[in-house]
């Protein structure tokens, strides 16, 4: 059964009530695009004239809405009309940019304060969604027309424009000098999250440095005073940026904080954190995910249960097959190369098993490790095997040295395969 549309006069009354009571959460809810619903069921635009004529709609809004919010409400309704009536995501996006710019002016003038941050959040959030919609619609249109883009910057025009606009919102938040009770600084971490999402989508990780530097310069309230969801956003994106910069120790630390603070009922968010935290823990701490943990996240389990099995057993063949099977997904999330880096751990476990089978001797011929690699499905010449052994020793996966005169690996008598290796 479809939801009954909300009559426009009831909608106006709700807006005015929210403004009068300074209920910014309710105001934000009524200025949001209800993406999960059929847009045609949101508002009843069938009041005579309002659907067919933008001029009549403007007049209706001006007569019905509190003065300071007239333009914002009108722009929001026009965004909905572009989506519902015209099916034009590009026009809807353009109108939302006007809405955002108008709202920024309200904040800059002081008519909007930190009390109105929920409205800023939803306007910026919808702006990002509309930019993605407009971007995807443009790509589909070009594909249908078989147009090849020469200028890549033109292809990302909406996303880049949105990043600049949301960066302005971030500046509005961090540069506020009002008392903390009404400060816009409370919006810094949420807006930072939206901005980082866009930078990562645009593959412009370096731009996150400017944001982080700005956050260090200004005096923000202690992070423990912010909503927990904002703190999770902050640590999650710090972890992702560190991960993409191959600073895996910092990434692991930040993602651990994000995971510990994230609400345990938000499985999707937990899965996003784990999708980066698990590979960093494997690489940095050699800690493999447990079956109990993976049982709660089927998507992760399909990748990491076979991968964990291969790593533990030193089965290079299965390790390679697992990466190959999930290559598209892992490459898309930029995790593939990190997991490829855990191949050394797989080799270490294979060589350790070989050492145990050979009675834990401190002297083993290079040919023994060559045979072990052959059994694991990797047939290599002896010189290549020596290079792998040298790499294992230099990285700390093995303790010992190679005696080339005797083609022998001389292992340490004490803990020749240490568990904790700095990477």
From Swiss-Prot:
Lineage here is: Eukaryota, Fungi, Dikarya, Ascomycota, Taphrinomycotina
* Annotated protein name in UniProt: Protein CSN12 homolog
What is the originating organism of this protein? Schizosaccharomyces pombe (strain 972 / ATCC 24843) (Fission yeast)
Q: One Gene Ontology cellular component annotation?
A: cytosol
Against PANTHER family, the record matches this protein to:
PCI DOMAIN-CONTAINING PROTEIN 2, UNCHARACTERIZED PROTEASOME COMPONENT REGION PCI-CONTAINING
| Molecular function as annotated in GO | double-stranded DNA binding; RNA binding
InterPro entries xref list: Csn12-like, PCI_dom, WH-like_DNA-bd_sf
The coding gene here is csn12
Domain named PCI is located at: 232-416
Q: Which domain of life is it from?
A: Eukaryota
């Amino acid at each position: 059964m479809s939801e009954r549309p909300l009559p426009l006069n009831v909608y106006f009354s709700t807006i005015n009530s929210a403004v009068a009571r300074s209920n910014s959460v309710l105001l934000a809810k009524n200025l949001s695009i209800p993406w999960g619903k059929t847009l045609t069921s949101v508002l009843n635009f069938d009041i005579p004239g309002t659907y067919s004529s933008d001029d009549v709609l403007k007049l209706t809004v001006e007569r019905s809405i509190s003065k300071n919010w007239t333009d914002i409400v009108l722009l929001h309704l026009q965004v909905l009309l572009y989506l519902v009536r015209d099916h034009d995501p590009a026009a809807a996006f353009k109108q939302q940019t006007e809405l955002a710019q108008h709202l920024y002016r309200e904040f800059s003038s002081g008519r909007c304060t930190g009390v109105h941050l929920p409205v800023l959040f939803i306007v910026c959030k919808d702006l990002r969604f509309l930019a993605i919609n407009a971007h995807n619609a443009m790509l589909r249109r070009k594909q249908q027309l078989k147009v090849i883009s020469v200028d890549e910057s033109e292809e990302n025009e909406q996303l880049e424009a949105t990043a600049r606009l949301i960066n302005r919102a971030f500046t509005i938040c961090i540069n506020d000098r009002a008392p903390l009770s009404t400060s816009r600084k409370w919006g810094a971490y949420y807006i930072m999250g939206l901005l980082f999402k866009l930078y990562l989508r645009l593959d412009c990780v370096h731009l996150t440095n400017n944001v982080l530097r700005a956050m260090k310069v200004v005096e923000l309230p202690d992070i423990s005073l912010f909503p927990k969801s904002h703190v999770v956003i902050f640590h999650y994106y710090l972890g992702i940026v560190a991960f993409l910069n191959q600073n895996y120790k910092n990434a692991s630390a930040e993602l651990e904080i994000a995971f510990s603070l994230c609400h345990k009922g938000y499985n999707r968010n937990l899965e996003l954190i784990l999708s980066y935290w698990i590979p960093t823990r494997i690489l940095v701490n050699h800690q493999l995910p447990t079956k109990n943990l993976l049982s709660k996240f089927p998507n992760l389990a399909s990748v990491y249960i076979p991968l964990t099995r291969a790593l533990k057993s030193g089965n290079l063949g299965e390790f390679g097959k697992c990466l190959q099977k999930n290559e598209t997904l892992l490459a898309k999330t930029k995790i593939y190369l990190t997991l490829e880096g855990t191949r050394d751990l797989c080799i270490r476990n294979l060589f350790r098993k070989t050492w145990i089978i050979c009675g834990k001797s401190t002297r083993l011929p290079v040919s023994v490790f060559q045979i072990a690699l052959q059994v694991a499905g990797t047939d290599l010449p002896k010189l290549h095997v020596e290079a792998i052994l040298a790499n294992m020793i230099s990285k700390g996966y093995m303790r010992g040295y190679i005696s080339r005169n005797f083609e022998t690996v001389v292992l340490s008598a004490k803990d020749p395969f240490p568990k904790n290796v700095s990477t």
